[in-house]
Regions:
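Extended active-site neighborhood of metal-dependent phosphoesterases/phosphodiesterases
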Residues: 55-140, 170-183, 201, 223-239
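Active-site environment of divalent metal-dependent phosphoester hydrolases
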Residues: 11-14, 51-56, 78-85, 119-122, ...
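His/acidic metal-ligating clusters that form di-metal
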Residues: 29-42, 123-206, 228, 236, ...
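N-terminal active-site segment of His-dependent metallophosphoesterases
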Residues: 1-60, 157-160
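Short glycine-enriched, charge-decorated loop/helix-capping segments at active-site entrances
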Residues: 15-21, 90-91, 120, 160-166, ...
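Active-site-proximal beta-strand elements of phosphoester/diester hydrolases
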Residues: 1-12, 108-118, 147-150, 203-209, ...
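His/Asp/Glu-enriched short active-site or ligand-binding loop at hydrolase and phosphoryl-transfer sites
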Residues: 208-219
Length: 265
């Protein structure tokens, strides 16, 4: 059982973003996880940890994550600043070339955490150097279940403005790297601020809303990002050898909750 959070977009505490308080919304998210999912094995936050890469915002993130009762692992996104992030979270592993890529060995299988950031750009990048690391890890673990985690999606999702800031041409490189490995069970990513699921070259994928603002389902948005105040969410993924179940929880939902005995259904 794992938790995915994405696109927290923290600003220095007390600073709003799009009319919302990113710190408070993340704290509420963590309170919900602690209350209902303290038995989860770990939590992965798939990038855009802060909105502007502020040192103070990363410090706030570290302080907030101290409240989380389960282990966590962090990915960077296009809104993050690698150097400042590494100063505040120096324990985050890097690959031999300095990218924030790591391999986690878990009871469910191998988790590969990828770095898709192109510094200073909203779109992603996955260069040959990073792809060689990924291929080496896939070769090393070719007889085990593998789960991929990244910030940018390696394909278009049908919202034109978001598709312009995906992995673009480097998506082909990722596909060429993973196409021969049938043991990849699922792909988790962030960046799009929407609940989206499907299959990419036979690999099931899911993504979800961020903890602050969201992107409206506007399939015609081309030269603007249609931000909304749709509810934030986190995902609960149940990983087993023969199936992957992904639940999405709108943790700010306060609608009526009624327990109905099964005997009376």
């Amino acid at each position: 059982k794992i938790i995915q959070i994405t696109d927290t977009h923290l600003m220095p505490r007390g600073t709003d973003l799009h009319g919302l308080d990113p710190c408070k919304r993340l704290e509420t998210c963590i309170e919900s996880i602690n209350e209902y999912h303290a038995d989860a094995d770990l939590c992965i936050i798939t990038g855009d940890l802060t909105h502007q890469g502020d040192r103070e915002a990363y410090r706030d993130l570290r302080g907030i994550l101290k409240q989380l009762s389960i282990p966590y692992h962090l990915l960077v996104g296009n809104h993050d600043h690698r150097q400042i992030f590494s100063e505040i979270f120096p324990e985050t592993p890097r690959d031999e070339h300095g990218f924030f890529q790591q391999t986690l060995e878990t009871s469910a299988g191998i988790f590969l955490l990828l770095d898709t950031v192109e510094h200073g750009m909203p779109w992603g990048s996955y260069c040959e150097t990073r792809a060689l690391w990924l291929k080496s890890q896939l070769e090393l673990h070719k007889n085990q279940p593998v789960y991929l985690f990244m910030h940018h999606p390696p394909f278009n999702i049908g919202i034109p403005a978001l598709d312009k800031i995906s992995l673009r041409e480097d998506a082909k490189r990722i596909h060429q790297t993973v196409k021969d490995f049938s043991n990849i069970k699922h792909l988790f990513f962030g960046h799009v601020h929407r609940p989206v699921s499907g299959s990419w070259h036979g690999i099931p994928f899911t993504t979800l809303r961020g903890t602050n603002h969201q992107v409206q389902l506007d399939l015609k948005a081309d030269d603007y990002l249609p931000f909304t105040h749709e509810p934030p969410a986190y995902c609960v993924a149940l990983l087993e050898p023969q199936q992957t179940i992904v639940h999405f929880h709108d943790y700010l939902d306060d609608s009526l909750y009624v327990k109905q005995l099964l005997s009376r259904v």
